[in-house]
Amino acid sequence: NGHGYYSAKRFFGKMFDRATLHGIPPIRFTGATLSEGSWHYQSIWNVGGGKNLYDVDTREWGSTTSQGKDLRDVTYANYFPVGMGGNFPINANSTVEQYEHIQAISVGLGTTYSLYLNQKDVESCPQKEAIFKVIRTWENARAANAFPRDKKKLLTKPEKNWRLLDGENKDTWILNELKDGKKVKSYILNRA
């Protein structure tokens, strides 16, 4: 309507107020552009997807452009979470190891990602149940703020392999560093 950012903020403000009035839980928004006031209504900053950001197969950032390298700089100590796009759909070729790695990178950098789910593709994945368990375990630990800064820094290293397990007690986890599929180090994590 020609009123720029002001009208966008008014629109989203009214939409959120109306949603609250109708008992609708908070609405999550993503957008590709940070603009004046967008933090009022955007939940995450979606800076793209595909191999422009993170390539889980080659474990490199920005394998086709420099966007991935930029993403790491943006996410560190930023209160506005950045998304790695919808790069990691579950399909017949997906493995538990890939999702342990994706979650480690995501937690280490403080990013989110969009998980594309297509029933036919998910059902074709022999490791689907284990993959969902991996995602749930990592997200439970993340929600509990169980990763201290020194562990987060370790998780950002693409050459490392990790496995996160539920601990013996509630609100505890065991973070194992793996080399050639074997545990080389273990760290006990606790709810903060």
Feature roles, as predicted:
Residues 1-3:
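Active-site groove signature of glycoside hydrolases
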Residues 5-192:
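Active-site-proximal substrate-binding groove within the catalytic cores of carbohydrate-active enzymes
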